[in-house]
Amino acid sequence: MLFARLVLLLVYLAPGSLAKPASTKKRTQWDQIAIDACAKELESHKFDTDVKGRHATLCTYEPALGSWLHCAKDVLDSRKKSKKIFEKTFSKINQYCHDYHKDEVVSNEEYYRIFANASLFIRPLDEVKENIRYPVTPNKASLDRWVWAYFGPLDNIDKGNVYGVTICLYWIGVLFIAAVYHFLNFSRLKQTVFKNKVSAFLRGHYVLPALVHNHAMSVGRWFFIGLVPTRLETLVLFGYVLLHGFLLSSYNFDHNELLSDRRSQVLIFLSDRAGILAFAHFPLIVLFGGKNSTMTWLTGIRYTAFITYHKWLGRFMLVDCTIHAIGYTYHAYIENYWKYVKYSDLWTSGRHAMIIVGILVFFSFFFFRRHYYELFVITHIILAIGFFHACWKHCYKLGWGEWIMACALFWIADRILRLIKIAIFGMPWAKLKLCGESMIEVRISKSSKWWKAEPGQYIYLYFLRPKIFWQSHPFTVMDSLVEDGELVVVITVKNGLTKKLQEYLLESEGYTEMRVLAEGPYGQSTRTHLFESLLFIAGGAGVPGPLSMAIKAGRQVKSNDSHQMIKFVWSVRNLDLLEVYRKEIMVLKELNIDTKIYFTGERKDESNTEEGAIANMSTEGRLLTTSKSAEMITDFGRPNIDEIIEEAVSGAKSLLVTCCGSEGFVDKTRELTAKRVLEHGDKWIEYVEEFQNW
């Protein structure tokens, strides 16, 4: 996606896109509220003057002006505002009275003189009904109604700004708690603190399990498919949804309806609040949608979880945008100003933003991500460009552009870090070899001593061929056991990029060399030395992560002469996979790691010919006569994961279960591990899932 990223960078650097928007300011200015509320209240009474015009009486008739100043002072004093705020009302009066004073600006000293003079003669307004000839103080109850009427709309916007920050603080709190929990992994303190029945109950019921049964495996049928969060992710999202709902439901309406009726207030207040909250989602969506290697390192939250939060934040941003758009559109119709605003830049950019974000969310459905991933990525980036630009145009005269600026800052920082990772790795040659019918082995010579990947980490590979150079996919990376300074990536052929690589290799007689770029590494390696027992479970092509981690743990045990128990279990149905990883499996055995390989290939019935008689041998016999890799197989059929986990935990005080495989395989392992956590509250059982699906 290099081209699309360059396009996005150009959009951000375009002069029009970087035009400085109006800054977001506090709207509740009490000097303004006091002046406006007092003007409304005083102008509802008749002073002894015949001057005409807006605020003419208050500006030109000194008893009225003195009343205005005293009224404003009383309003500000009741809110304990400073003398400086009171003096700001002088400049507001100068603005309102400019037409009557011509080019003359009344000084603060003159206003204080008028105020002092009025203090000598001021009376309560209730004592006179008409033709007022002296300064008066308005009825407090009547004045307060006007104060509240002006305060409500401004306070609503200010609260929206505070609530937008509140949403961000909620997620900062989530990240902080995750970071504290994660950094306990660097010591045995975590096992001491959390090794009890209460912790086991919480972890077994709410932290580890999927929401129902599926997490990695999609649910639904046909177009309506999707991924379900874990229970912990669901709890985090549920807290966010509750907070979001509360922040959309608290308003200070003017029940006296002095400035507008209740319907208009509901529409405007709700629309303003929703619009501000929508903008507050910008930095969170970009932050969680990036590769976030730093965020993962700090918090221990997997990329899959960040993408889950990214998706749900995007959906609720769409909800906020929809409320904002429908509310203002309906208000424009009922107040009969739609025809005057519908073609303005403000409304046009708002319509464009709504259309774009709707299409963006639609093409983000899991159906497109699964079946048309490259289409999804292209449309996602291009539509994001359009949405950001439309929102920028929509708000640059109003304020709230700071949210988009923060969003751009996170995006640029993420891209810079990714480019640095690519630059550090360099552009080495890679050797590609076709292994069997559905696998490609990629061997890459590391060209930089600064680049290092830990077991279980993955990289995004770019193959520099004309038709595919712009595509990248994540692959788990391993250090070669044959050549120092060489990385090994084994690719399972599916559709898209991997299919094109397979076709190119078939044209090249199964082998070729090409230059590659690598972005990463991402993910993190688990601190296996903190556990008494280690269980690595792999299914099919999900073996690289658990296998490399098992080898590293075995070497640490050997060098430290420790008594850590390590078991490696691999369920495989493809002999080609066994051949690809034969050297690594042999290393496991050399390290005396308990290795169990279960072959789940289908049994085939052949004819009863003499050749068929050989084919009708037991599966074990056929394998032993057809493959050198068959000698590594220890069992046939599916492994009993439940028994394997129970066996691993029974002889240890702490257990780490690491799993990677197909969707159903890892979901089942997660469920069974959570079950064991509940059963063994006196032991520390941790589960690490290497499989990632988004």
Curated annotation (Swiss-Prot):
UniProt keyword Cell membrane, yes or no: yes
Enzyme Commission number(s) from the entry: 1.16.1.9
Glycosylation sites: 117
Sorted UniProt keywords: Cell membrane, Electron transport, FAD, Flavoprotein, Glycoprotein, Heme, Ion transport, Iron, Membrane, Metal-binding, NADP, Oxidoreductase, Signal, Transmembrane, Transmembrane helix, Transport
Residue ranges occupied by any FAD-binding FR-type domain in the UniProt entry: 409-528
Residue stretches spanning the membrane: 164-184, 223-243, 268-288, 312-334, 348-368, 372-392, 404-424
Binding sites annotated in the UniProt record for FAD: 473-479
Membrane topology (Cytoplasmic): 185-222, 289-311, 369-371, 425-694
Annotated family: Belongs to the ferric reductase (FRE) family.
UniProt binding sites for heme 1: 310, 380
Keyword check for Signal: yes
Protein name: Ferric reductase transmembrane component 5
SUPFAM superfamilies: Ferredoxin reductase-like, C-terminal NADP-linked domain, Riboflavin synthase domain-like
Extracellular side, ranges: 20-163, 244-267, 335-347, 393-403
Gene3D superfamilies attached to this UniProt entry: Nucleotide-binding domain of ferredoxin-NADP reductase (FNR) module
Cleavable signal peptide: 1-19
Domain Ferric oxidoreductase: 274-408
Cofactor: FAD
Source lineage: Eukaryota, Fungi, Dikarya, Ascomycota, Saccharomycotina
Superkingdom of the source species: Eukaryota
Localization in the cell: Cell membrane
